């Protein structure tokens, strides 16, 4: 169930850990996923004041051998398109758009999902991937309201052609108290 009217391009870049990369490969999406991903050579944490390195992790052949797939960066819209196309190709999956889940009533052997139009459906399992204002989270003990942590992250996507000569590193600059 998706609240929006269709698959939308929201967000910028997504960093895919080896665990998630292995999952994409196991779902048969490895070739398409590999085409859109950029594999950084290392992850570097730097001090914001002087750009000195706090820590660097090489993502070399040893890392890939240990984890079976590399760490990868992808454009979110391209990843969503690959997954959306794979789901749409399945005959045993139905995507329902413009469907607003307002509550979930957990039960012993099934749960009832309530929708904004007053309808409901019963399921053996409910998986919530419904974001920061989750309707599903309170059903599994996540009762804390979201709050600002005081931290912010900024990302940008730059055309590959504009940065081809730069090292492919993930760099984090750590500011005060972080």
Language-model features: where?
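A conserved short coil-to-beta-strand element within the FAD-binding core of flavoproteins
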Residues: 97-111
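Short hydrophobic core segments
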Residues: 1, 79, 101, 121-132
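Glycine-rich FAD pyrophosphate-binding loop
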Residues: 1-12
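Central beta-strand plus flanking loop segment that forms part of the substrate or channel wall
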Residues: 76-78, 85, 133-175
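Acidic/polar residues in short coil/turn loops that connect beta-strands
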Residues: 50, 107, 117, 130, ...
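Active-site-adjacent segment of FAD-dependent monooxygenases/related oxidoreductases
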Residues: 12-88
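Short, conserved active-site loop motifs that form the nucleotide-linked donor/cofactor pocket
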Residues: 93-94
């Amino acid at each position: 169930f998706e609240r929006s009217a269709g698959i939308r391009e929201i967000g910028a870049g997504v960093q895919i850990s080896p665990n998630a990369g292995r999952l994409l490969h196991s779902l048969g999406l490895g070739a398409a996923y590999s085409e859109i991903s950029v594999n950084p050579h290392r992850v570097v944490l730097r001090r914001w004041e002087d750009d000195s390195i706090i820590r660097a992790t090489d993502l070399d052949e040893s890392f890939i051998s240990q984890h079976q797939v590399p760490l990868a960066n992808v454009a979110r819209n391209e990843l969503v398109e690959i997954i959306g196309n794979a789901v749409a190709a399945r005959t045993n999956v139905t995507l329902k758009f413009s469907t607003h889940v307002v509550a979930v009533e957990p039960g012993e052997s099934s749960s009832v999902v309530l929708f904004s139009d007053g309808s409901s459906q019963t399921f053996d399992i409910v998986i919530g991937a419904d974001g920061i204002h989750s309707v599903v989270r309170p059903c599994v003990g996540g009762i804390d309201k979201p709050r600002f942590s005081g931290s912010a992250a900024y990302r940008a996507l730059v055309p590959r052609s504009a940065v081809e000569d730069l090292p492919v590193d993930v760099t984090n600059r750590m500011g005060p108290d972080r």
